[in-house]
């Protein structure tokens, strides 16, 4: 049986009445994110790992209109590069695989159960403010804000506290999404406890141990980014002296 025939005949992988099935969760998440303005104009994406399968939203599709039959499925583990080596076991032939795929795989290699990519305006703005205030090597930092408690300290280390300082690394954007992979992995190595990486003038990647954690961490971070922008307008420091 050919690889293409296999990809066409695995529709059962995305057919389920269970609302918690990845093929149902990804469209629901994308509709939710569209309402926040995070995935407008087909931007952004989401991916979920279940056992040895990776479910991924397609590229170039209006995210609020995604349906379960639009979802790609990869065998895991699978090579990041070259793209032709990736082991798709379901591939809607009329759609393009997500350009975020190798970045999602980098998160799954760190034990994540879900990875989310958004084009949040607040995320973009804080990367510009950090660049202006700290230069290209600076990271986003904020402390003494209650919502910080929604972010983990690191794997198995519990959640951050009110007096902790949250640090989110920032990497430079590239012309093509997949070219961000090495910089993302370098940031993961430099900040081993982080659950997110900002991309300057682009957006953010957020991951979590499961779907609920990735979603709530993404929400908490976006809240903090918006608050940081408003604090900056008022001349208030992000990190309390």
UniProtKB/Swiss-Prot annotation:
Pathway: Amino-acid biosynthesis; L-methionine biosynthesis via salvage pathway; L-methionine from S-methyl-5-thio-alpha-D-ribose 1-phosphate: step 2/6. Binds 1 zinc ion per subunit. Its EC number is 4.2.1.109. Its main location: cytoplasm. It is an enzyme of class 4 (lyase). It is found in: Cytoplasm. Substrate binds at residue 100. Signal peptide: none annotated. Zn(2+) binds at residues 117, 119, 202. Residues 1-20 are annotated as: Disordered. InterPro entries: Aldolase_II/adducin_N (IPR001303), Aldolase_II/adducin_N_sf (IPR036409), MethylthioRu-1-P_deHdtase_MtnB (IPR017714), Salvage_MtnB_euk (IPR027514). The active site is at residue 146. Pfam families: Aldolase_II. SUPFAM superfamilies: AraD/HMP-PK domain-like. GO terms for cellular component: cytoplasm. One of its GO terms (molecular function) is zinc ion binding. Keywords: Amino-acid biosynthesis, Cytoplasm, Lyase, Metal-binding, Methionine biosynthesis, Zinc. It comes from the Eukaryota. GO terms for biological process: L-methionine salvage from methylthioadenosine. Its cofactor is Zn(2+). Catalyzes the dehydration of methylthioribulose-1-phosphate (MTRu-1-P) into 2,3-diketo-5-methylthiopentyl-1-phosphate (DK-MTP-1-P). HAMAP family: Salvage_MtnB_euk. This is Methylthioribulose-1-phosphate dehydratase. It comes from Blastomyces gilchristii (strain SLH14081).
């Amino acid at each position: 049986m050919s690889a293409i025939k296999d990809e066409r005949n695995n529709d059962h992988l995305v057919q389920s009445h269970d609302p918690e099935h990845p093929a149902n969760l990804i469209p629901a998440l994308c509709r939710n994110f569209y309402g926040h303005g995070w995935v407008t104009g087909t931007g952004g994406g989401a991916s979920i790992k279940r056992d040895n399968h990776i479910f991924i939203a397609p590229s170039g599709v209006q995210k609020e209109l995604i349906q379960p039959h639009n979802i790609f499925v990869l065998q895991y583990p699978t090579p990041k590069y070259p793209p032709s080596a990736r082991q798709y076991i379901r591939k809607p032939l009329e759609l393009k695989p997500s350009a975020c795929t190798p970045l999602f795989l980098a998160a799954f290699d760190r034990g994540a159960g879900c990875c989310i990519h958004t084009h949040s305006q607040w995320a973009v703005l804080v990367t510009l403010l950090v660049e202006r205030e700290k230069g290209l090597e600076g990271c986003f930092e904020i402390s003494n804000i209650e919502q910080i408690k929604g972010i983990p300290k690191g794997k198995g280390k519990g959640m951050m506290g009110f007096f902790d300082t949250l640090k989110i690394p920032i990497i430079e954007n590239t012309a093509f999404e997949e070219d961000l992979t090495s910089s993302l992995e370098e940031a993961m190595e430099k900040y081993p406890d982080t659950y997110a990486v900002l991309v300057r003038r682009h957006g953010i990647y957020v991951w979590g141990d499961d779907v609920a954690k990735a979603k709530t961490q993404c929400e908490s971070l976006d809240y903090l980014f918006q608050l940081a922008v408003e604090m900056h307008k008022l001349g208030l420091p992000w990190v309390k002296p």
